[in-house]
UniProtKB/Swiss-Prot annotation:
Belongs to the heat shock protein 70 family. This is Chaperone protein DnaK. Residues 577-613 are annotated as: Disordered. Induction: By stress conditions e.g. heat shock. Acts as a chaperone. PANTHER family: HEAT SHOCK PROTEIN 70KDA (PTHR19375). The modification Phosphothreonine is found at T173.
Length: 613
């Protein structure tokens, strides 16, 4: 069975890992980094992903970051006249991760386990699965990020029973999960979180502060300047990271904008105390979900054996201090918060392929599922924190006499009224025979698979007629749309590959021109004028071809010049060998004059040499 890669598709950064020799290993990207910024840029029809796109963001307005925040919504990004869904942008990132994983492994990769925040709803999970499909990946499993982290942490600790709290504060989402580890079983007891809290929000607090300070000092509002905002965003992220290690950092952005008197510069010293003050409300928002997870698991803080930190934002000292205060224990520092999720996903891939044995993962659904009933009430069928996969049915009836159809409004959430919860979908069970209100028996069955994706079925028990749907939100893509996006992604991948090959061809040709100039200089006066002219003519032809976009011509001229260069190199080698031989001969001639004693053989050679002369 081919390898299944593990992917942490993050808001800010993404990572990919694979199981090798029973151990999960992070695959470095082409730049050598172990995580890749979740940033996509478009420029003149070309796509850039990762660090390259992030660096160019200051000057390229067609740059998209933190797209994960929009998964499962109708959000569209319009770039160069084309609309992109969050699934398509995520697929571009996945495609990049897939491509360098293939380079590392030396084989095609078409299967993956992708992680999502535990608190992602059905629409967001479905969107993630669709993104994988568009990228050419068969998503074997969608796994919750805290659960993946626990897998990576607990793989070598299955001998002892432990209760673990995973505190996952990433770039855009926050989750807390409580798991029980023992005898190779990873059982999730509860999960809670906030899908709109993460490192990006901490950055924004710094940006808002810098904008306010600059306006106060200079009377200029930087929030209206796109390029200045991008520079502020980069500076804020760097300052946040710096303040995890030092108590004060200098933010210096020369020529940030221009005023009436000329260029203006931003110089601000940000202390950790000020940063903590600015972000206090964000840190406080992590407490309620932590308490909720403990309450749902029927545990107190003292029952927790180990606290695992996941996500780069858990490096913020105030966050660590809050966890310590809330749970009464020092968080475990033995895992890399940026890499542990992808590693856990790779381990789950190993469980699927059979490379990892005796490990059972029992995950839960993060939110209650139900339907709208009379009076606009949400009636739950599956309570939150139910172990998945699972299915549950309940029988309902009609609300009016001779009601011909029943509308099934599928909901996800914890609020008592239907309107306050997330609508997953609607469908209708029609052709119900005329009967008094309350007589027809309508069975509604909810089924949640191992990926947390929901199917709902409604059946008229009297007639046996049934209707079912795999839940897709209003933002969900149709199979046709996904197929078209898959084809577009494949075409783009082919184009990207071609562009890369053409860039390499151009670089090699440039290098060859440089080599020819160097070689001709070294051979000056040592080879025929005819040879020199031939090489120069071929070089000039290649330089001319390099001015255009005809890559076949560049290839042809490169090959011709290469052949000439090889012949010249042979001549250069022969020339050097001849000179060395001549030098050796000269030493031999001088030897009899310098030495009093020479052996007969040596003298004989000299005599021959003299005779030859």
């Amino acid at each position: 069975m081919s390898k299944i890669i593990g992917i942490d598709l993050g808001t800010t950064n993404s990572a990919v890992a694979v199981l090798e020799g029973g151990e999960a290993k992070i695959i470095p990207n082409p730049e050598g980094a172990r995580t890749t910024p979740s940033v996509v840029g478009f420029k003149n029809g070309e796509r850039q992903v990762g660090e390259v796109a992030k660096r160019a963001a200051i000057t390229n307005p067609n740059t998209i970051s933190s797209i994960k925040r929009y998964m499962g919504t109708n959000h569209k990004e319009t770039i160069e006249g084309k609309d992109y869904s969050p699934q398509e942008i995520s697929a571009i990132i996945l495609q990049y991760l897939k491509s360098y994983a293939e380079d590392y492994l030396g084989e095609t990769v078409d299967k993956a386990v992708i992680t999502v925040p535990a608190y992602f709803n059905d629409a967001q999970r479905q969107a993630t699965k669709d993104a994988g499909k568009i990228a050419g990946l068969e998503v074997e499993r969608i796994i919750n990020e805290p659960t993946a982290a626990a897998l990576a942490y607990g793989m070598d600790k299955t001998e002892t029973d432990q209760t673990i709290l995973v505190f996952d504060l990433g770039g855009g989402t926050f989750d807390v999960s409580i798991l029980e580890l023992g005898d190779g079983v990873f059982e999730v007891h509860s999960t809670a979180g906030d899908n709109e809290l993460g490192g990006d929000d901490f950055d924004k607090k710094i940006i808002d502060y810098l904008v306010a300070e600059f306006k106060k000092d200079n009377g200029v509002d930087l929030s209206q300047d796109k390029m200045a905002l991008q520079r502020l965003k980069d500076a804020a992220e760097k300052a946040k990271k710096d303040l995890s290690g030092v108590t004060s950092t200098q933010i210096s952005l020369p020529f940030i904008t221009a005023g009436e008197a000329g260029p203006l510069h931003l110089e601000v010293t940000l202390t950790r105390a000020k940063f903590d003050e600015l972000t206090h409300d964000l840190v406080e928002r992590t407490i309620a979900p932590t308490r909720q997870a403990l309450k749902d698991a029927n545990l107190s803080a003292s029952d927790i054996d180990q606290v695992i930190l996941v996500g780069g934002s858990t490096r913020i000292p105030a966050v660590q201090e809050t966890i310590k205060k809330e749970l009464g224990k020092e968080p475990h520092k033995g895992v890399n918060p940026d890499e542990v999720v992808a590693m856990g996903a790779a381990i789950q891939g190993g469980v699927i392929t059979g490379d990892v044995k005796d490990v059972v993962l029992l995950d839960v659904t993060p939110l209650s599922l139900g339907i709208e009933t009379m009076g606009g009430v949400m009636t739950p069928l599956i309570e939150r924190n139910t172990t998945i996969p699972t299915s549950k049915s309940q029988t309902f009836s009609t609300a009016a006499d001779n009601q011909p159809a029943v509308d099934i409004h599928v909901l996800q959430g914890e609020r008592p009224m239907a309107k306050d919860n997330k609508t997953l979908g609607r469908f209708q069970l029609a052709d119900i025979p005329p009967a008094p209100r309350g007589i027809p028996q309508i069975e509604v069955l909810f089924d949640i698979d191992k990926n947390g994706i929901v199917t709902v079925r409604a059946k008229d028990l009297g007639t046996g007629k049934e209707q079912n749907i795999v839940i897709k939100s209003s933002s969900g893509l149709t199979d046709e749309e996904i197929e078209k996006m898959v084809q577009d992604a494949e075409a783009n991948a082919e184009e990207d590959k071609k562009n890369k090959e053409n860039a390499e061809l151009r670089n090699n040709a440039d290098q060859l021109v440089f080599t020819v100039d160097k070689t001709l200089k070294e051979l000056e006066g040592k080879i025929d004028e005819e040879e020199v002219k031939k090489a120069e003519a071929a070089r000039d032809e290649l330089q001319e071809a390099l001015k255009g976009e005809d890559f076949d011509a560049i290839k042809e001229k490169t090959e011709s010049l290469n052949e000439i260069v090889q012949n010249l190199s042979v001549k250069l080698y022969e020339q050097a060998a001849a000179e060395q031989q001549a030098a050796g001969g000269a030493e031999g001639q001088e030897a009899p004059q310098n030495d009093d004693v020479v052996d007969a053989e040596f003298e004989e050679v000299n005599d021959d040499d003299k005779e030859n002369k």
